[in-house]
Amino acid sequence: MNLYLIGHDYRYAAEQMLLTLFPDERPEYPDGRPTGDRAELRLMSGTKVTTVTCVLVYHGQTANGRTSVPNGELTDPAEKDRRLQGAVKRAFYRAAMGIGLPHRPWGMLTGVRPGKLMTPLLAQGLNDAQAARQFERQYDVSPARADLVVRTAHATLRAMESLGEKDVCLYVGIPFCPTRCAYCSFVSQSVEKSMALVPEFLQALAREIAATAEAVRRAGLHVVSLYIGGGTPTTLSARQLDALCTQLAAAFDLSALREFTVEAGRPDTITADKLQVLRAHRVDRISVNPQTLDDRVLDTIGRRHTAQDIYDALRLVRETGGFAVNMDLIAGLPGDTPDGFRATLEQVLALASENVTVHTLSRKRGSNLMAQDAPIPDGAAVGEMLDFAGIVLPRAGYAPYYLYRQKFMSGGFENVGWTRPGQENLYNICIMEELCSILAMGGGASTKLVRPNGGKLERHIDPKYPTEYIANIDRICAAKAELEAFFQ
């Protein structure tokens, strides 16, 4: 679609709304007179208000959108940019509703973290109903989504109250998987092709662990959560997992640790000896992720395991004991149906895991789904799946405790973590709501530095490919040595 920005250059805001409303369109910025399918977004500054208008032409239909912001609310430069970008989105959205686009569950919101908009409303004293109504009016969010974000915001507020200024989380990324799932765009390395890289990668990781631990010690930080993810960390052998956990315990002061999570994920990598190693190192949370319990769908997405493998892996976890278990599901997988998803969720509930995370399929660039153009359930079918989850999970004693959104999600929905009472994963809340710093190590790991007052945020990302990670380990460790300065 052609985009014409008149009187401003808020490209990012215009493009985010374009991708939200018209996910199959890509932005173009032609010169000359406006033609074709297009959005003309004009900003006009008056004496009292600044107005944004949108003329939208799409498939022979034309509609207009308009919104204004009082100039008295635009005195701070940073706030001015934020408000005017929001006005560009709002005018575009209103025009799109004028040509009859179906209402989207999250209305005009385009961001990853809707909870960051809700938490301040509750913190300033609004009750749940008031906050939900304001959210609906301001962003045209559906009542069901407004209620959902209110409930997750309460979990955020509880987590905020429990964190001290010096509290941080640690993340360790292991970028290896036994096979690559069709929906995945993370550049994890197939062990069949690159097992030879694992020992050298772990040697480099040990150096980064040491450098990070020294920065943590010098800054006087307290590690409250440790999360090993990937990839699939349990791709490593029991001996390698033991060595990694030993290094972490020796390098960091873990006396303040409140949880230790390992994203086992794939049942074909979970063995009794690995579980015993993890329990010996105080790991108390683990994921066993079916995504679906339909063998036909599992084969379609390249998982290379069966539903029975999930049952067997979970039995091993329960026999080992001491783990809170999360199980991931994905709504909208190729070949799945609302009935199939219902059957999977009912079977998962019968397994009584402490957490259930319901993801919506995101058609990520770089995934095999995008390359193959695989047929997937439409937004209406995905909506049925999520509506069912939203009914049966609370009935089974689960409450939503974190949520986030991604680009190219089927139906424009969301990912939601559900928990039994008292079983929330603090790390998930902290990273999604940016409550504290996440110090990350390993392949593709993203360090996120957050000021306690929320006023500053920095990101540092390690290389994804193991070969690049190994080659750049000197630079990576040097950057970790500079972390201390952020906390001064």
Task: Please state what every model-predicted region is.
Residues 30, 42-44, 173, 229, ...:
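Solvent-exposed beta-strand sheet faces enriched in polar/charged residues
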Residues 52-54, 172, 286-288:
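Short beta-strand motif preference
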Residues 32, 36-37, 366-441:
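A C-terminal junction/extension of Radical SAM enzymes
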Residues 188-389:
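Conserved non-cysteine loop/helix-boundary elements of the Radical SAM core domain that shape
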Residues 1-124, 128, 205, 421-488:
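Radical SAM enzyme core and accessory elements
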Residues 167-202:
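Canonical Radical SAM [4Fe-4S] cluster-binding loop centered on the CxxxCxxC motif
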Residues 173, 287, 355-359, 429, ...:
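Beta-strand scaffold of nucleotide-dependent catalytic cores
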Residues 100-103, 123-170:
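N-terminal [4Fe-4S]-dependent radical SAM core
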